[in-house]
Amino acid sequence: MLDLITKTIDLRKGNPEQKRREILDYFEKTWAIDEKLYTQLKSDDVFYHRGDPLRHVLLFYFGHTAVFFINKLMLAKIIDIRINPEFESIFAIGVDEMSWDDLNEKHYNWPSVDAVRDYRQKAKQIVTDVILNAPVNLPITWNDPLWIILMGIEHERIHLETSSVLIRQLPLDEVLPGLFGKICDERGIAPTNDFLPVPGAELNLGKSFDHPLYGWDNEYGHYSEKVEDFKATKFLISNGEFLHFVNDGGYKTHEFWTKEGWDWRNFKQAEMPFFWRKNSKDYSLRLVAEEIPMPWNWPVEVNYLEAKAFCNWKTIKEGKTFRLPTEAEWIRLTEIFRIPDELEWESAPGNINLEHFASPCPVDKFQNGDFFDLIGNVWQWTETPITGYAGFKVHPLYDDFSTPTFDGKHNLIKGGSWISTGNEATRQARYAFRRHFYQHAGFRVVESETDLKIHNDEYETDHEVANSCETNWGDAFTTTTNFSKQLADYILETVKNKPIQRVLDLNADTGRLAFELAPHFEIITALDASARFIRMPIQLQEKGFIRYIVKDEGELVFYREVVLSDFGFETNKENILFMQDNANNLKPIYTGYDLIVVPNLLEELVCPIILLKHIHDRLNENGMLIIASTYQWDNHHTKREHWPGGFKQDGEPITSLEGIQNILSEHFSLEKSPIDLPLTYRKSSRINELLLSEVSVWKKK
């Protein structure tokens, strides 16, 4: 294992060829350690098992990290040939228990493990070739090809950790111990856990875009907060300390829990931490691939809801105010005691980066100033729901890494665990999980009388998403004609008296068209390639409202709130299934429709011709296809050779409609003369962009 230990890379120093070698070494070790993780499965059959019922089978994650590289390299136009389009669809999207996540196993025909191994080898060779041949310009920034390689590497290291948690949830007889590093053998009684004072300070959070290390989008930007004086536990809460809560009826007493926590406890019928085991006499602890007698001096591993209940129990028992630290308070602790960042380590200053153990260890083993385990051992839950700092912007090639978690339901974990490597082990890392999720995570307790400060933006500030909301829903605030409503009216008039029940909308955007059509059809499946966009109609469907900010003039903005019931869409909202998928590489499950609508999507696709050539396969006999497009072809999105029209061929002009007709004519007939509908993009209170979208209607032969 030690030969695979490495650190994330300084992207500013050195010479180009040295940096290329560093990145290749980092990639190869990342790939190897990820594959080593799965050697703990007892047989290939276990790949088809789920560690958690709310996660995919393990084979998905084995394939997913390789597919991620290929899909991102395709998206970045660094490569232009896929290895296996089917794999690159079914292994593409993971699960965060969002309502657009697809966990129906009937929708997946999982391939053999050997086929995935073969795919991984091919993907590894492609990534290696890119590393060896891509231009290297220092500093490497997020617009460079090698940034995409680093994105894939750090993504794989995230899954190294999260997949280890899933393996930890498998039955013990399905795993093999001793194949992934050495677990800690130091066990004893829990130490007394004192509260130590921490002086407050004005803090500046976030990092600049010229930072020397790779970062995810949520790390950049700036946010200032004054942290007041507080006290914090010297150690992480140990198994032994948490046992007092368990023995005092902690899991049976409603008043200790938040409403969300009590609902979870009742649903799970939880009586102790998930990885604890109890027989008639003793407790034991489940590790990734083995079970050991309970190490009472190791950190307890719980979800946020359990950690919060412990704090509430302690508050009631002692008459003081206890809670979890905020993100800013955790950062204050690391600043005071000058915890070095990853590149500054000679040896990891905590149980992190797999440098010491392949398990947690005693809470009093790694000292950082007056405290212990400020980093490493297990992640530390905070009170802070994740959101973007001021200046946040998404990376264009991974636009849904962070924004789906900016919902107030994902709390930050800080500090890393024994298996946190790469970016996860850096001081600026910002990872967040649903409050009921398990990771290798525990907590320390803070004592403070200061009101809890939660930085959580309720209004959507993503510029592109907010403008899309305004385009789709802004007619509630302006006199602008709404394109989606006009298109829906035209569709309903066109298909009147036709036996249409199942509809596929291939460009859900922020949902207006789907909601307009929902009262008139049995089921609307509305897809969008971006989780940034699809989460807005999901929120409308689930909460009944969305909020967003759009530009007025200069520094002035409008704060918008769209309420679904104001549009009369509440009654039939359940007729819609919003899902995330790429129209250029759709899953096989999206078939058997009576009507498919392609609204202003062709011009956004990498290869619209592929969609047009195969769209008939997804329609029922005599099915209808309605295409709306502005034909605004742009080489940035769609290479010239993939345009269906809008060019000269043999000296003669080929319009986009003619090109589309040439492609569709084998399977479709044009039903009626196309019409133009005005499409207004509202960019500010004084700037509108007006386009004409041509709408054509086709019938399957």
Language-model segments: residues:
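Conserved beta-strand signature within the Rossmann-like core of class I S-adenosyl-L-methionine
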Residues: N622-T630
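Conserved alpha-helix/loop element of class I SAM-dependent methyltransferases that forms part
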Residues: T478-I500
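Disulfide-stabilized, aromatic/cysteine-rich ligand-recognition loop
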Residues: L2-H56, G63-V67, L75-I126, V130-N133, ...
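S-adenosyl-L-methionine
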Residues: Q539-N585
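A short acidic, Gly/Pro-enriched loop at the edge of an enzyme's catalytic core
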Residues: N584-I596
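A short glycine-rich, Lys/Arg-flanked "PGG" loop and its adjoining helix->strand segment in the class I
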Residues: I609-E621
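Functional-site microenvironments in short loops/helix caps that host divalent-cation chemistry
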Residues: G152, E156-I158, L166-E186, P191-G215, ...
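Conserved Class I S-adenosyl-L-methionine
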Residues: E553, H637-P674
